[in-house]
Swiss-Prot record:
It is found in: Membrane. Residues 680-702 are annotated as: Disordered. Keywords: Glycoprotein, Ion transport, Membrane, Potassium, Potassium transport, Transmembrane, Transmembrane helix, Transport. The chain crosses the membrane at residues 53-73, 94-114, 182-202, 218-238, 246-266, 297-317, 327-347, 367-387, 419-439, 451-471, 476-496, 504-524. Expressed in roots and shoots. This is Potassium transporter 7. The lineage of its organism: Eukaryota, Viridiplantae, Streptophyta, Embryophyta, Tracheophyta. Residues 74-93, 203-217, 267-296, 348-366, 440-450, 497-503 are extracellular.
Length: 811
C-alpha cells in the first residue's frame, strides 16, 4: 500500500468519521498526481456540532462520578498511618501518584485503548463477553442456532473471519473453563451493582459533610448523615419518573462543577504553593515510597478513589460515541481534575491540619455556599448515572439467563435503553441507606467503594486481553503486554484495597457473594429445566402417527405455545392434549430467546419455520432479542405473526416451485421482515369498532367470553390502544390453490382468536440428588421463582387469552 494511503487511513481512524467526508484521489502512473481531500463544509460543521453536543451531554451521564472524586480522595488517603507523614514531600508524592494514576488508567488504558473494543457501538463488561462468545464458542446460552450468526450485527465490520488456535480450541473444549469465564464476568457485574450502592452513599455524604464546618455554624455529624439519607431517599423515590425529564440539567451541573473546581485549584496553586508543578515528575512517586514504605502502599486504597467512575466511560459508550467521550475527557475532565488535585495538594502543603476536610477547607470562604450547592447537585448527578448503569447491568444479566425475572420499564420514548427496574431500585435504596447509617463515615465507605471499582477494572483488563487475541486476532504477546502494563498497576491497588477489608472493604465482597449466589442458582435451575425439556421433547414420529388432526379435536383459533426449545415439540404439548384432547386449528410454537449481540434489527427479529407436513398447520416462531434490547409490550405482535407466517408460506411455495419439490422441509427457518408486507398474499385493513364487533360475532367464541373480553379490553389501557386490523387474501394476486387454502385457514383461525399457552412448572430435584443440589433446586431456586415476575408478565401476555399448563420437572 502506498504511503499516502496509510496517511489517509490514519486520518480517518483519528477522526472516526470516514462516512462524513469525500476523498478524491487521483493517481497517474503509480505516482500521486493530485491528492485532494475535500471536506464538505456543511457536513464538517454538522459533524463538529454532533460530536460537541454528544461530548457536552456525556458530562452528565458518564463523568458525574469521576468528577466528584476530589471531595474525598485526600481525606481517604491520609486516613491511615500516612497521617504521620505531614510534610511537603509526602503531599507532593501523593499528588504525583494521583496524577500518574489518572494518566495511565483512565487516559491511556480506557480513552486510547479500551474504547476501541466496542460491540456495535456498545461498551461494558457484557459487550466484551458478547464479542468473545461470537468469535469463539464460549457462550453458555442453551438455545443458540447457526442462523444467529447470519444477523447483520453478529460480526464486527472490518474484523476478519474466525480463526482457530490451540488456545481457542482448549477453552472451547473445556466447559468448566467457559463456566469460569461466565462467573468471572458475573463477578464483575456484581461489583458494578455494588457501585450502585456505594456511589450514592459516598458522593452525597461527602457533599453534605461540608455543613459540618462552614464556619461557626457547623452542624453535628448525626445531622449530616440524616440530611444525606433524606437526599438519598428522594433520589431513589424519583427513579420511577424517569431521568429524561431532568437529564437536560445534568450536563450543565457537571460542567459548572468542573469549571469551579478547576478555577479553585488554579487559585490554590498560585496562592499557596506554585512549586507543586514539580510533582508532575514521577521522581516524586519514588521519593514518596522511599519515605513512607508500607504506610505509603496502604494509602493507595485512598488514591484509588481518584479513578472511581472510570469504567463508566466504557460502560456508557452506547449512548454516545468514542470520539465524543474522548473529546470530553481530554478537553475538560482530565485538565480540571488535575488542576483540582494539584490545587488541593498546594493548599495542604501549607495547611496540613486541614487534611480531614481538605476540599471544603481549600475553597475560599466567600465561595463556600455556591460550591456546596454545586457539589451536592453534582453528587446527585453522579449517583444517578451509576444507578442507571446498575439497572442496565441487571437487564443484561437477565438476558443471559443469570438473573430472576424482574419488571423492566422503558422510561423514555426517545432515549433507547433508558430503563427502570422497581425491585432493584428499592433494594439499592435499602442497601444504600444501610451503608450510610451503618458506616457514617466517607473513609470507611471509600474503602468498600475502592475495592469494588478496582475489581471491575481488573475484570475489564483480562477480558480485553482475550478480545485482543480472539476478536482483534493479534499476537498473544500483545495481550500479555496489555495485561502486564495495566494489570500490574491494578494488582498493586487491589492488594492495598484488600487490606481495607476489616475497615469496610468486606461490604462489596458480601454484596457480590449474595448477588453471585442468586445469579448462579437461577442460571443452574433454569439450565436444568431447559435440559429436561430438551431430553423429553415429543418426537416427530409420534406427531406423524397421529395424522393431520393430531388425534384430537382441532378447534377454531390460533394456539401460541411458548417454549424455550428452538427445535422439536415440547413436552408441554403432549401433556396438554393428553389431559384435554382438543387444540387449535393453527399451532405456533413460540420461542423468545436472547442472542449475544447488543441489538437485533427489527427486520431480523423473527425466524419462521414449519413443523411437520403442510396439512398439520403447525409452525415455529423464534423471536430474538439482544442483551441491550428492551422487550416492550408489542401491541401488534399477533398481526406481525400472522403476516410473517403468511410470508413464510408464500416463500416456501415459491422455492418449492423453483426446485420442483413440494415437500415441506422440517427444521427449515427463514428470517421474515415484519415491516415488509409485500409477498404475503394478504391485505391488512384497519377495522373500526363496529367492524371489530362484527368480526367477533362471526367467531366461534361464546357470548359470555366475548362479553368478558370486551370488559377486559376496556379496563386494559394497552389492549384498548391496540390497532384493530382485518386480513383479507389479495384477489388480484395469482396464488397457488394449496397456498390459498393454507392462508384461508390462517385467517379463519386469526378471526376466531389467539390463545397463549405457557407452562406453569414446578421444578423438583430427583430423589437420588445430593444435598447441595436438593437445596439449590427445592429451596433456593423455588424461592426465587415464587418471588420473581411470572413468565406471562415478562412476555406481556394478556391475561384474558392466557392458558397455563401445570407440569412437574424432576431435574
Amino acid at each position: 500500500m502506498p504511503s499516502y494511503q496509510y496517511l489517509l487511513s490514519l486520518l480517518f481512524y483519528i477522526l472516526d468519521c470516514t462516512d462524513r467526508f469525500s476523498v478524491i484521489v487521483t493517481i497517474h502512473n503509480h505516482r500521486v498526481g493530485v491528492l485532494m481531500i475535500v471536506l464538505l463544509q456543511d457536513q464538517w460543521k454538522s459533524y463538529c456540532r454532533t460530536i460537541s453536543l454528544l461530548a457536552f451531554q456525556s458530562f452528565g451521564v458518564v463523568y458525574g462520578d469521576l468528577s466528584t472524586s476530589p471531595l474525598y480522595v485526600y481525606k481517604s488517603a491520609f486516613s491511615g498511618r500516612l497521617n504521620n507523614y505531614r510534610d511537603e514531600t509526602t503531599i507532593f508524592g501523593l499528588f504525583s501518584l494521583i496524577f500518574w494514576t489518572l494518566t495511565l488508567l483512565p487516559l491511556l488504558k480506557y480513552v486510547i485503548i479500551v474504547l476501541n473494543a466496542d460491540d456495535n457501538g456498545e461498551g461494558g463488561t457484557f459487550a466484551l463477553y458478547s464479542l468473545l462468545c461470537r468469535h469463539a464458542k464460549f457462550s453458555l446460552l442453551p438455545n443458540q442456532q447457526s442462523a444467529d450468526e447470519e444477523l447483520s450485527t453478529y460480526y464486527q465490520p472490518g474484523v476478519g473471519g474466525i480463526i482457530s488456535s490451540p488456545l481457542k480450541r482448549f477453552l472451547e473444549k473445556h466447559r468448566k473453563l467457559r463456566t469460569c469465564l461466565l462467573l468471572f464476568v458475573l463477578f464483575g457485574a456484581c461489583m458494578v451493582i455494588g457501585d450502585g450502592v456505594f456511589t450514592p452513599a459516598i458522593s452525597v455524604l461527602s457533599a453534605i459533610s461540608g455543613l459540618k464546618d462552614p464556619g461557626p455554624g457547623g452542624i453535628p455529624d448525626g445531622w449530616v448523615v440524616f440530611i444525606a439519607c433524606i437526599v438519598l431517599v428522594g433520589l431513589f423515590a424519583l427513579q420511577h419518573r424517569g431521568t429524561h425529564r431532568v437529564a437536560f440539567m445534568f450536563a450543565p451541573i457537571v460542567v459548572v462543577w468542573l469549571l469551579s473546581i478547576g478555577v479553585i485549584g488554579l487559585y490554590n496553586i498560585i496562592h499557596w504553593n506554585h512549586r507543586i508543578f514539580l510533582a508532575l515528575s514521577p521522581h516524586y512517586v519514588i521519593k514518596f515510597f522511599k519515605m513512607t514504605g508500607k504506610d505509603g502502599w496502604l494509602s493507595l486504597g485512598g488514591v484509588l478513589l481518584a479513578i472511581t467512575g472510570t469504567e463508566a466511560m466504557f460502560a456508557d459508550l452506547g449512548h454516545f460515541t468514542a470520539a465524543s467521550i474522548r473529546l470530553a475527557f481530554v478537553g475538560a475532565i482530565y485538565p480540571c481534575l488535575v488542576l483540582q488535585y494539584m490545587g488541593q495538594a498546594a493548599f495542604l502543603s501549607r495547611n496540613m491540619s486541614a487534611v480531614e476536610d481538605s476540599f471544603y477547607q481549600s475553597v475560599p470562604r466567600s465561595l463556600f455556599w455556591p460550591v456546596f450547592v454545586i457539589a451536592t447537585l453534582a453528587a446527585v448527578v453522579g449517583s444517578q448515572s451509576i444507578i442507571s448503569a446498575t439497572f442496565s447491568i441487571v437487564k443484561q444479566c437477565l438476558s443471559l439467563g443469570c438473573f430472576p425475572r424482574v419488571k423492566v420499564v422503558h422510561t423514555s420514548r426517545w432515549i433507547h435503553g433508558q430503563i427502570y427496574i422497581p425491585e432493584i431500585n428499592w433494594i439499592l435504596m435499602v442497601l444504600c441507606l444501610a451503608v450510610t447509617l451503618g458506616f457514617r463515615d466517607t473513609t470507611v465507605i471509600g474503602n468498600a467503594y475502592g475495592l469494588a471499582c478496582i475489581v471491575v477494572m481488573f475484570v475489564t483488563t483480562w477480558l480485553m486481553a482475550l478480545v485482543i487475541i480472539f476478536v482483534w486476532q493479534k499476537n498473544i504477546l500483545l495481550a500479555l503486554l496489555f495485561v502486564v502494563a495495566f494489570g500490574s498497576i491494578e494488582v498493586v491497588y487491589l492488594s492495598a484495597a484488600v487490606t481495607k477489608v476489616p475497615q469496610g472493604g468486606w461490604a462489596p465482597i458480601v454484596f457480590a457473594f449474595v448477588f453471585m449466589l442468586v445469579m448462579y442458582v437461577w442460571h443452574y435451575g433454569s439450565r436444568r429445566k431447559y435440559l429436561f425439556d430438551l431430553q423429553n421433547k415429543v418426537s416427530m414420529k409420534w406427531i406423524l402417527t397421529l395424522g393431520p388432526s393430531l388425534g384430537i379435536v382441532r378447534v377454531p383459533g390460533i394456539g401460541l405455545i411458548y417454549t424455550e426449545l428452538v427445535t422439536g415439540v415440547p413436552s408441554i404439548f403432549s401433556h396438554f392434549v393428553t389431559n384435554l384432547p382438543a387444540f387449535h386449528q393453527v399451532l405456533v410454537f413460540v420461542c423468545v430467546k436472547s442472542v449475544p449481540v447488543p441489538f437485533v434489527p427489527e427486520d431480523e427479529r423473527y425466524l419462521i419455520g414449519r413443523i411437520g407436513p403442510r396439512e398439520y398447520r403447525m409452525y415455529r416462531c423464534i423471536v430474538r432479542y439482544g442483551y441491550k434490547d428492551v422487550q416492550k409490550d408489542d401491541e401488534n405482535f399477533e398481526n406481525h405473526l400472522v403476516m410473517s407466517i403468511a410470508k413464510f408460506i408464500q416463500m416456501e411455495a415459491e422455492e418449492a416451485a423453483s426446485s420442483g419439490s413440494y415437500e415441506s422441509s422440517e427444521g427449515r427457518m427463514a428470517v421474515i421482515h415484519t415491516e415488509d408486507t409485500t409477498g404475503t398474499g394478504l391485505v391488512m385493513r384497519d377495522s373500526n369498532n363496529e367492524a371489530s364487533g362484527t368480526s367477533l360475532t362471526r367467531s366461534s367464541r361464546s357470548e359470555t367470553l366475548r362479553s368478558l373480553q370486551s370488559i377486559y379490553e376496556q379496563e386494559s389501557g394497552s389492549l384498548s390502544r391496540r390497532r384493530r386490523v382485518r386480513f383479507e387474501i389479495a384477489e388480484e394476486e395469482r396464488i397457488d390453490p394449496q397456498v390459498r387454502d393454507e392462508l384461508a385457514d390462517l385467517l379463519d383461525a386469526k378471526e376466531a382468536g389467539v390463545t397463549y399457552i405457557i407452562g406453569h412448572s414446578y421444578v423438583k430435584a430427583r430423589k437420588n440428588s445430593n444435598f447441595l443440589k436438593t437445596f439449590a433446586i427445592d429451596y433456593a431456586y423455588s424461592f426465587l421463582r415464587k418471588n420473581c415476575r411470572g413468565p406471562a408478565v415478562a412476555l406481556h401476555i394478556p391475561h384474558i387469552s392466557l392458558v397455563e399448563v401445570g407440569m412437574i420437572y424432576y431435574v
